[in-house]
Amino acid sequence: AAMREAMAAADVGDDVYRDDPTVLALERRTADLLGKDDAVYMPTGTMTNQVAIRTHTEPGDQILIDANAHVARAEAGGPAALSGVMTKGLPGIHGVFTAEDVHAAAMPVHPFTPATLLPPTKLLCIENTHNGGGGTIWPLDAVEAVCAAGRQHGLRLHMDGARLWHASVATGVSEREYAAPFDTVSVCFSKGLGAPVGSALAGSSELVARARRFKAMFGGGFRQAGVVAAGALHALEHHRAGLAADHSKATAFAGGLSRITGIGIDLARVQTNIVRFTLAAMPSGAFVERCHDAGLHLLTTGADGVRAVPHADISEAQIQKALAIVGAVVSEQAA
């Protein structure tokens, strides 16, 4: 209710002309939290990531990224279509790769291969937390190590921090500390924070000015954007601390799943608010459909994989109800 009231009362203007006071306030607050000069508000996290790639690269370049990262697998082929770049997948473990992986990928394929035959490697991206890895947190020392390796090869650095708020709450490492090594950082105001619309891209004044051009090119211009920016600003100021409760609900749900015969889960991988598990004897599609019919909404992650994401609107009682639904569906299949 408080977020809706803030949105209804928002001062608005025209973001295209940069005279929307609420958007400007959101951009200033985001830049300050991340320790950057400036930030630009956009409709989606996919747009902030793709604008960042276009800002840092030219067609024919190559970017280094975990092979299962959102940018590489779930942004509609944007790097190729919008920036004309290649993605070189790094062999991360649940999304986390090493400095050695960066060195190996950034080196020429063969010392005698002419440089003119190779795509210039320009950008290194990480995703923190890592969605495909199950909400995996990058430790700060691992972030600093891979960024240092990237700098050794002259690479620019971008962090897809759509869920950075989760990493910060879980570890106690501030968003500013996590963002410090990077040229640009994207953050999302809906992932856990509960705003209806929007992400922001933060960086130096020069990079953000360049990014604003590509925001316009990619169709990201708003008019009375303050209405949705007010929701994002409210979420930023009031909802970050509540993420710890979401993590506790995920831990409780995962623990309950581990006691259900026919469910496979690695509890060590449940680090934030994403719970991934496998089914021993039932296709995930049929399982998710049965759960949906019973009032539990889940996603498939492959033939036998399932993903659940507790959030602020889910109560502890609903976690127990969800476990009961899962147990009933699995038992029915076994019978």
For the regions a language model picked out, list residue spans one by one:
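Conserved PLP-enzyme active-site core in the AAT-like
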Residues: 1-10, 14-281, 285-294, 298-314, ...
